Amino acid sequence: MTPRISPERLAESLAELARIGGRPDGGVDRLAGSPADVEARQWLAARMREAGLEAGLDGVNNVFGHPPGAGPWLLLGSHTDTVPAGGRLDGAYGVLAALEVYQALAMAGHPAAARVALVSFHDEEGVSGHGFEGSEHFCASAPLASISGYLELHIEQGPRLEAEGLELGVVDAIVGIDRYDVALIGQANHAGTTPFSYRRDAGRAATRFIGGLRELVQGIEPRMVANVGALQLEPGAPNVVPGAARFVLEVRCPEPAALGAARARLEDELGRIATEEGCQLEFTPQTSWPAMAMFPGYVAALERVAQRSGLPWRRLESGAGHDAEILARHVPAAMLFVPSHEGLSHSPREHTDDRLLAQGCQALLDGTLEILGG
């Protein structure tokens, strides 16, 4: 008989962790390295030890728990740090679901309990750094040799599953992310005395590009998305034509070739608009994270679990970055998603019904057994 997780125990664990760094509005502040973050990691290590695991914090504050012995282990986990005013489920759900899976296996006396290890990675969010510091450190350190693979359960952080009436998602890829620093240099001038035809308006050049960005990237690949989250106009006065416009352009896509093709198309379009507006273009690649396919064997195993569960499900790519993409460079890795209510995440309003959280946790347990061979 397949071991069953305890929905009540999972809900209690989530509520207890949410109190560490909890906010009056229901959100959580556990920025990486903050006192609340450290307290949460110490709490988690204690919970792992109570469950019978050997657990502690490494040099960068990853929490790693494993059964006695030398492995190899299938690693389950995620992260417990948050963005400012974050939600209680992002990352934390995957960590505590992993703990619940181990507890269910151990309490049932199932032999798979000896083949499972748990982790909460440090600084996935990258609020003060580049992100994924913990998983990158883990993959460059000794414990990796004892890991046979990695599974991560997560809220979707987007609207697709809920909008389609689905309750489980099997992730087959994590998008690649490219960021570019863009500067359009025109000429500042008096906004009242300079006719439109004489202007070298960097603000107009920037907004022309941003206004057509959606159609441009979807013409490259329908699953591609792009964003300009902040636009700085200089000198920034209501009566001065902007002499410079600066912004960071972010592009995401699960298809590596399309992401590569986007760079030339975006730079060409910016160059065309800059020329028409009498501006100069500075286009500088900033950071790049490659798209990462999940391990086909693990994806197939999770699809079998989803099919047997009777839950409505689909295969999908992740539009957000996750520690799984770092692990996938080194060991087989895959992910499961549960719906996010109204697609909200990185927000105090982040929410998923307890029933869906429990179903996802059981799917993680079933997937663990499917991969380990029962």
Model-predicted segments: where are they?
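A generic, well-ordered mixed alpha/beta core segment in the N-terminal half of proteins
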Residues: T82-L144
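His/Asp/Glu-rich mid-to-C-terminal helical/loop segments that flank catalytic regions of hydrolases
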Residues: T194-G219, L266-D268, V338-G374
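Acidic/His- and Gly-rich active-site-bordering loop/insert found
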Residues: R4-G87
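Midchain, well-structured core segments that form catalytic/ion-binding scaffolds
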Residues: P111, E124-V127, E133-A257
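A short beta-alpha structural unit
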Residues: R30-A32, N227-G236, V248-E255, Q280-V299, ...
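Acidic, glycine-rich active-site loops and adjacent beta-strand->loop/helix elements
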Residues: T80-V83, A117-S128, Q157, A188, ...
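Flexible, glycine/charged-enriched surface loops at secondary-structure junctions
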Residues: D58, P111-A112, E215-V228, I273-T284, ...
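Zn-dependent metallopeptidase/amidohydrolase metal-coordination segment
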Residues: L10-S13, A18-R23, L74-S78, W313-Q362
